[in-house]
């Protein structure tokens, strides 16, 4: 093989390690006033659950959704009658509508269709995943017929739901957010997450790493001097380990490692496979053919897993499970651990790696912070404790809310909130980035665990005489040959004047912004000719046109959701008003005793007619329900006015007292 000097030509592309393209992020980071930015929210966009928080009045509020829950399922569903459901409502109808209930999109976003993990996962999804230019798309039957959705579109719907939850609580419109991603997400996954925010109508001011956000939640009020913190973040679908030093508000990530395809969903799947095999052995029937049965099992297995964090044995009971037969089996904690022990043990490898990368020993770690719902599993806690020679992990933060908490603090800093302290956040890129040089060699420009933002340049040259063009191929990964690493993209630098090999000087610059998004530039120092890439040309990226179309689709869905809600509200108002009148007329001690027989009959006829109309026009539009209520009020109101005048009181405003009465009656 030819010897090569630091000069030979190569190809560089955009790098895959940090994904959000944030032009001018450093300004965002600056002292923007609240008047410019407004309130910024922090969103933990999780595989299985999402959470939103806001920093105000000197503290973080984690915001509950309309069901009173502080975490919201990352589920989207399309019902047979054309309604779109997001969150709890979507997850609650999974077993009755499995093919059109979409979840786990965080495991698809930013990945190619032929990715091994995607091919593994789609075997277990009840919904259909198709190949669109080697990008996974999800098929669903919507009110407008069958639709194909990019993972970014589904994530955008979840982000919109989290924004709606915040807007309802804050009573104002929100346009800016900090969104978290796994530390081990690559550039494509980060950029796709940023795109999802754009589709949702959110300006994602910053993408921050989940374990870093959790460290902020843990250490914001810690003032005891420098400490080494290890964050062990095992969630529903991803796993990260980050080692940080915290020193009076300065959070510096020293090293990070993880697995973007390991979490509670995998533990559930192992248990499901166990019960599917057991059922086949006992009954001779394969339930995999029935999506509803599989999703019923999924629901019960998740419940059982949670219960086994405190109990040692649980029983799973499912009525009419398959072919009309019930399901009843027990699961012990020991069996659950046996089914997943290799996965549990695999979490120790990244722990070992971050310590090695930081050149620290287990005894150098001052605090272990457990984050993510899966860290409630006793065996996981035991393995972590044993690895650190019996050291107890910190119990000070809520593992479900810590990431959103940290994101909300960062959001508070960006929006100029007071009392966020002198917070300084120094994060790192998780994977080495470089370009391919002669012979398929990976020439590294930015090593993993380099503090970001960062910029690094190196001079390369041509590999052949009179070579007019060089191709810059950008890779991420730790292997010495590019074939073993991940290609992020490539671009050409053309117009190089004829010259012997090794003479032209081509400067390649890698620049990673605060979001971990990579920009690669190549410049011919002789001519000043320049080209660059920010991953836009990668086939896995959405084009600006795609994003614009998806924004319009998202707005259309929001309008449709609003119309559905208006219809439901109008129907409920009419129904509530009619039944309230019916109940009051039937009450012989109240209104029923005060009305003349003639007036009573008049109202009764009108109410019965309205109820009958409701039964036969359940799918009417909101205007029709409102008109019917106005019509009913037109009959009732003069009678009520006459009644009040006879008793010497003022008449109630049009129908309001009765409808308020109705609401009180129904409490």
Curated annotation (Swiss-Prot):
Motif Prevents secretion from ER, residue range(s) on this chain: 664-667
Gene Ontology CC: one annotated term: endoplasmic reticulum lumen
EC number: 3.6.4.10
Binding site for ATP: 46-49, 106, 236-238, 302-309, 373-376
GO molecular function, one term: ATP binding
Residues in the signal sequence: 1-22
Keyword Zinc carried by entry: no
Keyword terms of this UniProt record: ATP-binding, Chaperone, Endoplasmic reticulum, Hydrolase, Nucleotide-binding, Signal
Activity regulation summary: The chaperone activity is regulated by ATP-induced allosteric coupling of the nucleotide-binding (NBD) and substrate-binding (SBD) domains. In the ADP-bound and nucleotide-free (apo) states, the two domains have little interaction. In contrast, in the ATP-bound state the two domains are tightly coupled, which results in drastically accelerated kinetics in both binding and release of polypeptide substrates. J domain-containing co-chaperones stimulate the ATPase activity and are required for efficient substrate recognition.
Catalytic activity: ATP + H2O = ADP + phosphate + H(+)
Pfam family, one: HSP70
Stretch list, region Disordered: 641-667
Main location: endoplasmic reticulum
Start and end residues of each stretch annotated as Substrate-binding (SBD): 409-509
Family, as annotated: Belongs to the heat shock protein 70 family.
Role noted for this protein: Probably plays a role in facilitating the assembly of multimeric protein complexes inside the ER. Is required for secretory polypeptide translocation. May physically associate with SEC63 protein in the endoplasmic reticulum and this interaction may be regulated by ATP hydrolysis.
UniProt-recorded name of the protein: Endoplasmic reticulum chaperone BiP
Natural source organism: Aplysia californica (California sea hare)
